[in-house]
Each structure stands twice: as C-alpha cells, then as structure tokens.
C-alpha cells in the first residue's frame, strides 16, 4: 500500500481501511500469542500501513 494511492481515496474509505487494518493487527497479535503465526513480518507491515493511513487522514484534516 502506497501513500500516493491512499491520498486519492476519500476520508470515509480511509476510515474503513484503518478499521480493517486495526482488526488485522488484533488478529495477528492473537495468533502470535498462541504460537500460530508463521510469518511474523506481517505484524510490522500492518503497523506501518496503519501509520500511513493515519498520516494521510491527518493531512486531509489539516487541508
């Protein structure tokens, strides 16, 4: 997910995307704690995607 692509989305789409990413992060944390997570790098990817979405939302709020 690129920030340039996120900037083209509406605020409502970004909020929906953020909600989905937060749910994915929660599920990954649960899988990690139970030992079911094989690809641990996905936690880092989701965390950075969340940061990208929040950054774009803040940019749109300030504009």
From Swiss-Prot:
InterPro entries, sorted: Ribosomal_protein_uL29, Ribosomal_uL29, Ribosomal_uL29_CS, Ribosomal_uL29_sf
Pfam families (UniProt xref): Ribosomal_L29
GO BP term, example: translation
Family matches, as Gene3D superfamilies: 1.10.287.310
Keywords: Ribonucleoprotein, Ribosomal protein
Keyword Ribosomal protein assigned: yes
GO cellular component terms, semicolon-separated: cytosolic large ribosomal subunit
GO MF annotation terms: structural constituent of ribosome
Keyword check for Ribonucleoprotein: yes
PROSITE patterns for the chain: RIBOSOMAL_L29
HAMAP family named in the record: Ribosomal_uL29
NCBIfam families xrefs: L29
Similarity annotation: Belongs to the universal ribosomal protein uL29 family.
The protein's name in its UniProt record: Large ribosomal subunit protein uL29
Species annotation: Tolumonas auensis (strain DSM 9187 / NBRC 110442 / TA 4)
């Amino acid at each position: 997910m690129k920030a340039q692509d996120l900037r083209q989305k509406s605020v409502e789409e970004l909020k929906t995307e953020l909600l989905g990413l937060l749910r994915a992060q929660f599920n990954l944390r649960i899988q990690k704690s139970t030992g079911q997570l094989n690809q641990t790098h996905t936690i880092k990817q989701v965390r950075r995607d969340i940061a990208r979405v929040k950054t774009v939302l803040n940019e749109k709020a300030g504009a």
